[in-house]
Amino acid sequence: MPVVTMRQLLDSGVHFGHQTRRWNPKMKRFIFTERNGIYIIDLQQSLSYIDRAYEFVKATVAHGGTVLFVGTKKQAQEAIAEQATRVGQPYVNQRWLGGMLTNFQTVAKRIQRMKELEEIDFDDVAGSAYTKKELLLLKRELTKLESNLGGIRNLTKAPSVLWIVDTKKEHLAVDEAKKLNIPVVAILDTNCDPDEVDFPIPGNDDAIRSVNLLTRVVADAVAEGLIARNNRGSGTTEAPEEPLAEWERELLEGSKAEEAAAAAPAENAEAPAAPAAEAPAAAEAPAEDAK
């Protein structure tokens, strides 16, 4: 069963790009045509890139990774918070603070400050050690901290992957991820730079329905990864520690090929007595994998 169908992409308007005068020439290979001054994105490519990103996110989470959902534009705020919360992942949907990743120690102190303020009973003025004015100021501080840091309150270290809606608006997040070699999975509209993203998904990053659909797909990948992680943890083998970013990149590209190569000699060794009868079947297996 496909991760998402062509009909779903069409109904959500994923194929609509920006006006032809607002584009990045590097996105030319992802553009299908132009209609009424608007670029139309090639959804066949989008489907392929969605599958690739889905498998990567699922594999990363299955091996103990964390996905940080990022989208501060109005069209993305609700979907980012809803889908990230659904699968228990951190998110930023109000404002990206400079140094949120590269200076995480300072951010962690602000998160701790937020948790300390949450312990205060702002309604009990008489039993508090603060004056009414001080409580009001502390309440305002808490509200601001919750707005900026509430989505990452349980984040204890840099995430394994970033899911980003609109890489142009979230350029600070993209830059910090690059410095730390954290892979970026993102929607690529026709005005974006594909060189900034490790796992691009060509699509509309402005329409609410498009953002909702693609963010839900990424959250579904996280959910599958969590299930696989739990299944692995309940078995005899322990799940490995959170992988490094470079290892995560290699995981999606190389694991399937290695498994297929290791399985072929084992099958041949088990049935040496009937080479003639099983030769056609052995020859067909690689062809099916190639599809």
Swiss-Prot record:
Pfam families: Ribosomal_S2 (PF00318). GO terms for cellular component: cytosolic small ribosomal subunit. Residues 246-259 have a biased composition (Basic and acidic residues). Keywords: Ribonucleoprotein, Ribosomal protein. Residues 260-285 have a biased composition (Low complexity). Residues 231-291 are annotated as: Disordered. Gene3D superfamilies: Glucose-6-phosphate isomerase like protein, domain 1 (3.40.50.10490), Helix hairpin bin (1.10.287.610). InterPro entries: Ribosomal_uS2, Ribosomal_uS2_bac/mit/plastid, Ribosomal_uS2_CS, Ribosomal_uS2_flav_dom_sf. GO terms for molecular function: structural constituent of ribosome. SUPFAM superfamilies: Ribosomal protein S2. HAMAP family: Ribosomal_uS2_B. PANTHER family: 30S RIBOSOMAL PROTEIN S2 PROKARYOTIC AND ORGANELLAR (PTHR12534), SMALL RIBOSOMAL SUBUNIT PROTEIN US2M (PTHR12534:SF0). Belongs to the universal ribosomal protein uS2 family. This is Small ribosomal subunit protein uS2.
